[in-house]
Design a protein with these regions (language model features):
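Hydrophobic/aromatic beta-strand patches that form the interior of the parallel beta-sheet core
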Residues: 16, 40, 118-120, 193-195
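PAPS-dependent sulfotransferase catalytic core
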Residues: 1-84, 227-228
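PAPS-dependent sulfotransferases, especially Golgi type II membrane carbohydrate sulfotransferases
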Residues: 1-15, 155-170, 174-177, 181-194, ...
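Long, charge-dense
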Residues: 135-162
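PAPS/PAP-binding and catalytic site of the sulfotransferase fold
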Residues: 25-38, 110-114, 134, 192-216
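Glycine-rich phosphate-binding loop used to anchor ATP phosphates in small-molecule kinases
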Residues: 81-109
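Conserved phosphate-donor/acceptor-positioning beta-strand/loop module used by diverse small-molecule
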Residues: 113-136, 198
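Short His-Asn-centered micro-motif
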Residues: 19-21, 97-101, 123-124, 197-198
């Protein structure tokens, strides 16, 4: 039961949760850590909590509940969705690692529930992220709104209604990463690591793996970094660098100054 799990959460040893917008190599990282001794890595556990993640964003943004109350609500939802996985973790003595981006807005609740938990924030150049979202037709049909966060009052927000798809996906990038930045400010350095997916190399990968305290061989790292997973194909016109200047300006108005903070030129 969930009550039994709550009593044993202290036995869930050093779980790792990736926080991101998605489209940041989450499947790639789950594959990498699947070979690490003593770790059980998940890319898309079921339920994936996409709709619940949107609810988590909404309830925190609305501010209708006290922080403690909203965290309690979100803790119950998170545990209901991950009960069997966390129980497996402590009973089988394998560390839990989840790269699924749909737990991002549960970050505060997870940090409180699991004091041993570590978090990895992965960000990506907003132009590349938006290009990927466009390719997946985000915000072009109703189903997307159930899996991607939207402004709390989006149905009656004239600004949102007037946004192009590029502006909406840019907003998603900025809003998600801004939330994670605020969350990171509440944690000590030994619980959070930030990783730039757009400039990944062997050195930065070494640092990320060291932060998780996982054991992955040098041979495996070198092999993995050459692999590509869940990759989308683009025409030249679809690539951010070849966008019309107006589209780039629309993105920049929304994604700066955070993009500059990350060292991205947009």
């Amino acid at each position: 039961s969930v009550d039994e799990l709550k009593k044993n959460l202290h036995l869930v040893e050093r779980p790792v949760f990736f926080l991101s917008t998605g489209r940041t190599g989450t499947q790639w990282f789950a594959n990498l850590f699947s070979t690490a001794e003593g770790i059980k890595a998940y890319h898309a556990p079921s339920p994936d909590l996409a709709a619940q993640n949107c609810f988590a964003y909404k309830i925190q943004k609305q501010g209708k509940f006290k922080k403690e109350e909203s965290e309690e609500i979100l803790s119950h939802i998170f545990l209901a969705g991950r009960e069997q996985y966390l129980r497996y973790s402590y009973k089988c003595r394998r560390r839990y690692l989840e790269t699924n981006n749909h737990i991002t807005f549960f970050a505060y609740a997870i940090a409180d529930l699991l004091p041993q938990a570590k978090f990895i924030h992965i960000h990506r150049h907003p132009g590349d992220f938006v290009s990927s979202g466009l390719k997946r037709s985000w915000f072009l049909d109703g189903s997307s709104d159930k899996r991607q966060i939207v402004p709390v009052d989006h149905s009656s927000d004239p600004a949102w209604s007037s946004f192009t798809t590029i502006q909406k996906i840019s907003w998603l990038w900025n809003e998600t990463n801004s939330f994670v930045e605020s969350f990171k400010n509440t944690l000590p350095n030994d619980r959070i690591h930030t990783f730039d997916f757009s400039s990944m190399d062997l050195d930065s990968l070494h640092e990320l793996v060291a932060f998780t305290e996982a054991r992955i061989s040098e041979k495996r790292l070198k092999s993995q970094i050459t692999r590509r997973m869940n990759v989308q194909g683009y025409t030249e016109a679809e690539r951010y660098n070849n966008w019309p200047e107006k589209d780039k300006e629309d993105l920049a108005k929304i994604c700066n100054p955070l993009a500059r903070q990350y060292g991205y030129s947009i």
